[in-house]
Amino acid sequence: YAYTLTKNPNFPGNFEGQTANIETVIVKYTPQDTMMDQLKTGAVDILYQVADGDQIEQGLDMVEEGNFNYLSYGRAGYGMISLKCNQGPTQFKEVRHAMAYLLDRVTFAQTFTGGHGTVVSGPYGTQQWMAEEYAEELDGLNSYTYSLDSAVKELEDGGWVYNEDGSDYSGSGIRYKKLDDGTYMPLVIEWFSSENNSVSDLLVTSLQQNPDVEAAGMKINQTVGTFTDLLTYYYDNSTENPYQMFNLASGFGNPYDVAFQYEPGSSNNTNALEGEEGQKLYDLALAMNHTEEGDDEAYAKAWFDFIADWNDELPEIPLYSNDYHDFF
């Protein structure tokens, strides 16, 4: 897709009388695997917010060769696995924890960003001032260091201790959990990912096809489709939604305001985290907004309290927070 913007001849200018110097701007979708070639051949003039490590390195090589330049800056956002907390296995916190333990997020972040990013413990960017203020406290949060044993313990503590027929788990195959209605739920997670996505490709090898996922008694099924379809399922909070797992990224505004994303019953609450846990997280997010203007210390404390509770509930699994690069 592409959108064409043309200079408005009726615009009087800003307060200094300045008007646009460029007559036409075309904003177009550029596939990740061809974006650098398009920049090199002049098919595009600017690549904005490049995040993939391989593409960044290719762009930096082009800059070193001459004729191109770049800007880099810390991202006020992060990439994540978003999970539905109202249906399927991911409605149970122990499953969300187990998934985090089964993904080597340090290696994932290093591989995807090419060293231009790092792992975070919640929904924030490493260069946001609150994260810098509370760096030591953030280091004390659960980092979900890769561990099959920790994943298995979470699942056992969560009641995933049965075979399909209700007998004690045999130690191989899919685990099951006995629900309140007497039925047994298989530990099978349905994942919808967008096509031509390098993060999805990396998640296939590092999580979905990771032998330790099978060893833990878990299975993740991947369905690939368009990004438009992904958003349809991502915003569907009904219990009939066939998918519980999505990978995408999110940016944060200034000021940092995420309360609307966790309001119970809201369509913006895409994790569908409800009940006492959801209300608590929402109240903590609201506390930031209710801080007296100018009281940075109180705001940062409220921010950390929200992050700490989020880190335990884990409605999403943080993958990376990275530096953006613009090439031109």
Label the model's feature ranges:
Residues 3-4, 22-28, 185-195, 220-222, ...:
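Short, well-ordered beta-strand elements
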Residues 10-58:
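Ligand-site clamp/hinge motif
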Residues 24-26, 82-88, 95-98, 134-144, ...:
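Second-shell loop/turn segments in exported
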Residues 33-45, 51, 61, 93-94, ...:
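Short helices/loops that flank or line small-molecule/ion binding pockets
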Residues 56-72, 241-242, 255-271:
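Ligand-binding "clamshell"
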Residues 66-76, 120-123, 317:
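A structural signal for short loop-to-beta-strand junctions that line the ligand-binding cleft
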Residues 91-209, 305:
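Append "and occasionally in soluble cytosolic enzymes with long acidic Gly/Pro-rich linkers
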Residues 97, 144, 217-231, 256-328:
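Extracytoplasmic/peripheral linker and loop segments enriched in polar/acidic and small residues
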